[in-house]
Amino acid sequence: SVGANSIRLAHYQHDQYFYDLCDEKGIVAWAEIPYITVHMEGGRENTISQMKELIAQNYNHASIICWAISNEISLQGVTEDLLENHRILNDLIHRMDKSRVSAMANLFMLETDSSLVSLPDIRGYNLYYGWYVGEMEDNDTFFDQFHKEHPDTVIGLTEYGADSVIS
């Protein structure tokens, strides 16, 4: 247990000032490229370029613990081209930065045994129990079942629904 606050800098690269604040305040940060919702064949070079830039520009920020490959990318299904692009990005992360891990935020409807979700070092799930589906307590059930099936896998809650906020 690190005992630190964390933030997911989701969906796009953020201003250097914010990364500086995370370093200064000791906030653990998840950095992510804007590879979201739908995989576009022919967009591979763009995603590679964006990942290279994200890592090169932010490598020296101590607050960053992971480089995230994508967010909810499986909305239109998992294709071989999508898988190959994720393999390339995952390998690129590990070549450019051997001190940090790769991560990905997965759509809550994606099966936990999908070949896509096992690629990065950290699996994040955007769960909307208590908003789109089910009850808020279903978050507990999901994570308990996942941990039982995958006790050595690093997992996190990367998004949750506005109506499921505990007040």
Predicted regions and their residues:
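Substrate-binding/catalytic cleft of secreted carbohydrate-active enzymes
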Residues: 6-167
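Phosphate-binding active sites in nucleotide-utilizing proteins
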Residues: 3
